[in-house]
Regions:
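Short, solvent-exposed loop/turn segments that connect beta-strands within catalytic domains
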Residues: 46-49, 112-116, 164-166
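Exported/periplasmic cell-wall-interacting domains
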Residues: 131-134, 143-259
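Short beta-strand segments
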Residues: 9, 29, 52, 75, ...
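A short, compositionally biased
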Residues: 25, 48, 99-105, 153-154, ...
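Cell wall/extracellular polymer interaction/catalysis modules
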Residues: 81-145, 155-156, 252, 257-259
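Extracellular adhesion/carbohydrate-binding repeat motifs centered on closely spaced tryptophans
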Residues: 1-94, 150
Length: 259
C-alpha cells in the first residue's frame, strides 16, 4: 500500500491495481479506475449531488438497486449505484420537514424520527436583518399565487403557522406580477443562500410539491452552525444544484406550466 495525497493505492509488481475490491487492514473497500481506495460514501459529482456507497463490510462495488440502513438512516440506491435523493414516490405524507438555515437546505422525512429521508430541497431563508425564526411549526396550504411584500407574488404559498409575524411562507421566488414569465433572474440565482425577508424560498417545482403534499405537516427550522462544504453532504440527501435557465431566462426552469 502507498499513500499519495489523501488517497491510498495498492501496487502489485510496481503497477497500480484498479477496479478491484480490496481490504486494507481491517477495512473493506474498492480500488476505482484510477486505483484510489474508497469505502463508505464516495462522491461522484459534488455539483450534481451524486454519491455512491461502498459497503465496508464486503468491499464490493457500489450498492445498486437496493436500500440500506446506514448510520441510522434508510437510503435507496438506483441501478447505477447513485443515492436516490427523492423517494417521495415511495413515501407519502404527512411529512416532517427540517430547514437547516446554515446550509440552505430543507430535508423532508417520513416523520420526526428522521430515520427515512425522503427529499431534499434547496432553499433561501431570511437575511440577517429579516431572519427566518427558529422553531417548530405546522404547515398549512395557502394560495396558488401568494401575495407578498412589494407588492409581489410567489407561486404555491404554504404558510408556516406561528412563525414570524404571521406572514412567513414557503413559496417560489417572487415576481412583480402574477405571471410565470416574470422571474427576477438575480433572485433565483440566490437560491441556497439567505436572501428573503423571512420567508423560505424554493424553485417553483419544489414550492408546488410542498403546496400539494405537506398540508398539515410539521416543520422544524434551525441554524446548525456547521457549514458543510460538500453539496452532497448538506443533509442526508445533500443539496441539489439550481436548474439552469432556458430561453429568455425570465421564468423558473422547473415551472411545470412553462413548456
Amino acid at each position: 500500500w502507498q499513500k499519495v495525497g489523501k488517497y491510498w493505492y495498492y501496487l502489485q509488481n510496481y503497477t497500480v491495481v484498479t477496479n478491484k475490491s480490496m481490504k486494507r487492514g481491517s477495512v473493506n473497500g474498492y480500488l476505482d479506475s484510477q486505483g484510489r481506495f474508497s469505502t463508505g460514501w464516495v462522491i461522484y459529482s459534488d455539483y450534481y449531488d451524486q454519491v455512491r456507497y461502498i459497503d465496508p463490510d464486503s468491499g464490493s462495488k457500489y450498492l445498486t438497486n437496493t436500500r440500506r440502513w446506514i448510520d441510522g438512516k434508510l437510503y435507496y440506491f438506483d441501478k447505477d449505484g447513485y443515492r436516490r435523493n427523492d423517494v417521495s414516490s415511495i413515501y407519502g405524507g404527512p411529512y416532517y420537514l427540517e430547514v437547516d438555515k446554515t446550509n440552505g437546505v430543507m430535508t423532508v422525512y417520513t416523520n420526526s424520527s428522521k430515520s427515512i429521508p425522503v427529499k431534499t430541497i434547496r432553499v433561501s431563508v431570511g437575511l440577517s436583518g429579516t431572519p427566518t425564526w427558529d422553531g417548530t411549526y405546522r404547515l398549512s396550504r395557502s394560495l396558488r399565487w401568494q401575495p407578498l411584500m412589494g407588492p409581489s407574488w410567489g407561486q404555491y404559498g404554504t404558510h408556516v403557522d406561528g412563525c414570524g409575524q404571521g406572514g412567513i411562507f414557503i413559496h417560489s421566488v417572487a415576481g412583480s406580477t402574477r405571471s410565470v414569465y416574470n422571474l427576477p433572474a438575480g433572485e433565483y440565482l440566490k437560491l441556497g443562500q439567505p436572501a428573503s425577508h423571512g420567508c423560505i424560498r424554493t424553485c417553483v417545482a419544489d414550492a408546488k410539491w410542498v403546496f400539494e403534499n405537506c398540508n398539515g405537516s410539521t416543520i422544524h427550522i434551525y441554524s446548525s452552525g456547521n457549514y458543510v462544504n460538500n453539496e452532497s453532504f448538506k443533509g442526508p440527501l445533500g443539496r441539489r444544484p439550481l436548474a439552469t435557465f432556458r430561453g429568455a431566462g425570465n421564468f423558473d426552469p422547473t415551472d411545470p406550466e412553462v413548456p
